From Swiss-Prot:
It is linked to Spermatogenic failure 10: An infertility disorder caused by spermatogenesis defects. It results in decreased sperm motility, concentration, and multiple sperm structural defects. The most prominent feature is a defective sperm annulus, a ring structure that demarcates the midpiece and the principal piece of the sperm tail. This is Septin-12. GTP binds at residues 56-63, 89, 115, 195-203, 251, 266. Changing D197N: In SPGF10; results in significantly reduced GTP hydrolysis due to impaired GTP binding; disrupts interaction with SEPTIN7, SEPTIN6 and SEPTIN2; absence of SEPTIN12, SEPTIN7, SEPTIN6, SEPTIN2 and SEPTIN4 from the sperm annulus; disrupts interaction with LMNB1. GO terms for biological process: cell differentiation; cytoskeleton-dependent cytokinesis; protein localization; spermatogenesis. It comes from Homo sapiens. Residues 112-115 are annotated as: G3 motif. Filament-forming cytoskeletal GTPase. Involved in spermatogenesis. Involved in the morphogenesis of sperm heads and the elongation of sperm tails probably implicating the association with alpha- and beta-tubulins. Forms a filamentous structure with SEPTIN7, SEPTIN6, SEPTIN2 and probably SEPTIN4 at the sperm annulus which is required for the structural integrity and motility of the sperm tail during postmeiotic differentiation. May play a role in cytokinesis (Potential). The gene is SEPTIN12.
Length: 358
């Protein structure tokens, strides 16, 4: 399946496919299947890039969840009780690590948003987050329109944003609704119920259904979006995922011995909460979605939908759209004029010209 067969906008219907070309009768083996081996060798040599953002109030286990996802000490959280003051403004911090498993390299960038929703007045607290996402689109666009550009443009665009919903047991808060409405138009959003072990199974399911109703009522289109299902297999798989979103998750980065085997989990006086046990939480569904089944699809939608929408708007604003065959104006706008569709000013900073391979 060609991952690039997506319409440039979710509002546009797919074009009817042209009549298929009849297969040519072959007289013998040619070796076409070797192309797959070539792609695999090249992919393992180049490695993969994946950029994830975690958003939510302090104390919801964002850092622990990232460490649990990748089974590494990707992010170190500040332990409670050290007198660390709450940030007065929203800050964004990014860390990049290279994770290797069975010869496959993954360049992982995690962006945390400490201070989100922690203030008494949270008006426009989403502006720095949306501005950061659009700034990464702008950096990629400025590299893309250069006459002489790098063979491999470093991709810092946010491929997925995991939004942590507090386990209140009621419904989405006005802050959640307002932020998700803005965020889902710019990036792939996967909401999760944080610290789900604080809810009973009945409370968890009722909370999930109320959140799903909130998402439908306020037209919040979270990932995986229904309009991007490419075939019947996608529809079957994604419909099951959509029915379970938001996933009720528990994070833990310590191993415990249970029935003679080591498991990741949280130890309580009632027992061990196993994060990879579906009877305890839905962390395996989140892990499979982000890594095992939909990682490349998250990157494809980011490039072909969200970034493409941003690129078209920016080129229209800057009058850089081609006016005829072969015509293109490559002069970028001045930094003070680089505005996103939401009038957030982006000043392009220094770029890390890292090598293609890592």
């Amino acid at each position: 399946m060609d991952p690039l067969r997506r319409s440039p906008s979710p509002c546009l219907s797919s074009q009817p496919s042209s009549p298929s070309t009849p297969p040519c009768e072959m007289l013998g083996p040619v070796g076409i299947e070797a192309v797959l081996d070539q792609l695999k060798i090249k992919a393992m040599k180049m490695g993969f890039e994946f950029n994830i953002m975690v958003v939510g109030q302090s104390g919801l286990g964002k850092s622990t969840m990232v460490n649990t996802l990748f089974k590494s000490k990707v992010w170190k959280s500040n332990p409670p009780g050290l007198g660390v003051p709450t940030p007065q403004t929203l800050q964004l911090h990014s860390l990049t690590h290279v994770i290797e498993e069975k010869g496959v390299k993954l360049k992982l960038t995690v962006t945390d948003t400490p201070g989100f929703g922690d203030q008494i007045n949270n008006d426009n607290c989403w502006d720095p987050i949306l501005g950061y996402i659009n700034e990464q689109y702008e950096q990629y666009l400025q590299e893309e329109i250069l006459i002489t550009r790098q063979r491999h443009i470093p991709d810092t665009r946010v491929h997925c944003c995991v939004y942590f919903v507090p386990p209140t047991g009621h419904c989405l808060r006005p802050l959640d609704i307002e932020f998700l409405q803005r965020l889902c138009r710019t990036v792939n959003v996967v909401p999760v119920i944080a610290r789900a072990d604080s809810l009973t199974m009945e409370e968890r399911e009722a909370f999930r259904r109320r959140i799903q109703q909130n998402l439908r009522t306020h037209c919040i289109d979270v990932y995986p979006q229904m309009c991007f299902d490419e075939d019947i297999n996608d529809k079957i798989l994604n419909s099951k995922l959509r029915d379970r979103i938001p996933f009720a998750v528990v994070g833990a980065d310590q191993e415990h011995l249970v029935n003679g085997r080591c498991v990741l989990g949280r130890k309580t006086k009632w027992g061990i909460i196993e994060v990879e046990n579906m009877a305890h939480c839905e962390f395996p569904l989140l892990r499979d979605l982000l890594i095992r089944s939909h990682l490349q699809d998250l990157k494809d939608i980011t490039h072909n939908i969200h970034y493409e929408n941003y690129r078209v708007i920016r080129l229209n604003e800057s009058h850089l759209l081609p006016r005829g065959p072969g015509w293109v104006n490559l002069a970028p706008a001045s930094p003070g004029q680089l505005t996103t569709p939401r009038t957030f000013k982006v000043c392009r900073g220094a770029h890390d010209d890292s090598d293609d391979e890592f």
